[in-house]
Amino acid sequence: MRTLRFLISARHLCARGRGIPAGQALGTGNNAQKQVTCCLHTSPPPGPPQATSSAGSVTPYEDVFQREQRNKASFVEVLDLYCNRDVRRRGHVEIIEAALRWMTEFGVEKDLEVYNKLLDVFPKEVFVPQNYIQRMFNHYPRQQECAIRVLEQMENYGITPNKQTCFLLLQIFGARSHPIRKYQRMMYWFPRFKHTNPFPVPAELPADPVELSRMCLHRIANDLDSRVAVYQMPYTEKCDDGKEREHLHVVGIQSPSQVSLLAAHNPSTPVYVEGPFPLWLRKTCVYYYILRADPDPMRKEEEIDNERSLYYPLSLDLELDRDLGDDDSFDVDDVEEGPVFAMCMAGSGDELLLGKWIRGLQETNPILGQTPVVFRLNSGPQELSVPQEKEAEPKGELEDDEGEREPERRRMEQ
């Protein structure tokens, strides 16, 4: 009788949950037991899946990311909108992955506060393992992988986590989780590699092109005695016809050893202006030009006495314990290159603008007035896109410019 009462009560509960009429819930013996077993193990009725509401999907948040003004305030506003919508935070993985894709568009990819805000989207104390078996396996793997992707993006942009990041990860996943291990590795290596570069690039680059060129040339030049000279400052000139003509900057650098090397150059051998060569400073790419010559085949290296050479010292320290297979020296193919006499940075790769650099070098290097100068210029990115105003100029003005450049070019080749 006790078993029968339990089966009848279970039948009533199933009838309430599935909407079965109460009259069908009455039964005795084996019939009641069969009905309860059938009700407990029956799959849901076949049919098309019910459409979820648009509020529970992540697609509206993609639309919000596209619709809002792309700044930090609107990005945080979208995250607050999601957090205040539902306490259970359904779809939190999708919204975090969508936010990671849009961070560069909003300009917050290097903001630590925004990354902590993304981690705050996870529900708290839900994914913490409760026993050693859950800790042994990857507990809630999708959520842990999503948090690791957030930390990896922080690592790619060089952002060091803080104590709030650790507190959020402990509150969300616990102390033995994979995101915590990732956080510990980042905190171990980031402080060690933060100051390894002896020539660090400043976080904020100067906006002035002359100061930026001065800083870049100092980074390229290996001689501390190098002198930077500004041959032309950027300015705007008004022509007689009322049009404004913009003059770009020209900044060069040369060391005393390069001056002496150029003074010993044979005037009958031409020198070359080559470029542009790219130089990356974080996300900014600048271009520089060099003045060089071909290697002199008649030049003989001065033989150094063994007593005065550092490569042939008087005392030899032979490692007799090493075998021939222990040679860890590198096999380097020495490529003989020509001497580099000077470097410069200019607003454009125009021969007329670089000619002002050569004329400025003639003041400290008189031999350039007797040496032919040949321009070997590649099509840089600034020359690929021709403005529409220059394309619309009449042919007469272009011929006048060519006429002005021709005597300049002949004088340099003499």
From Swiss-Prot:
Region spans: Disordered: 379-414
SMART domains, per the entry: ECSIT_Cterm (SM01284)
Principal cellular location given in the protein's record: cytoplasm
Annotated PANTHER family: ECSIT EVOLUTIONARILY CONSERVED SIGNALING INTERMEDIATE IN TOLL PATHWAYS, EVOLUTIONARILY CONSERVED SIGNALING INTERMEDIATE IN TOLL PATHWAY, MITOCHONDRIAL
Keywords carried by this UniProt record: Cytoplasm, Immunity, Innate immunity, Mitochondrion, Nucleus, Transit peptide
Organism of derivation: Xenopus tropicalis (Western clawed frog)
Function, in words: Adapter protein of the Toll-like and IL-1 receptor signaling pathway that is involved in the activation of NF-kappa-B. Required for efficient assembly of mitochondrial NADH:ubiquinone oxidoreductase.
One GO CC term on file: mitochondrion
Record protein name field: Evolutionarily conserved signaling intermediate in Toll pathway, mitochondrial
Family: Belongs to the ECSIT family.
UniProt-annotated location(s): Cytoplasm; Nucleus; Mitochondrion
Gene3D superfamilies xrefs: Tetratricopeptide repeat domain
Domain of life, source organism: Eukaryota
InterPro entries (UniProt xref): ECIST_C (IPR029342), ECSIT (IPR010418), ECSIT_N (IPR046448), TPR-like_helical_dom_sf (IPR011990)
Keyword Metal-binding part of the UniProt annotation: no
Organelle transit peptide: 1-27
GO biological process, one term: regulation of oxidoreductase activity
Basic and acidic residues bias spans: 388-397
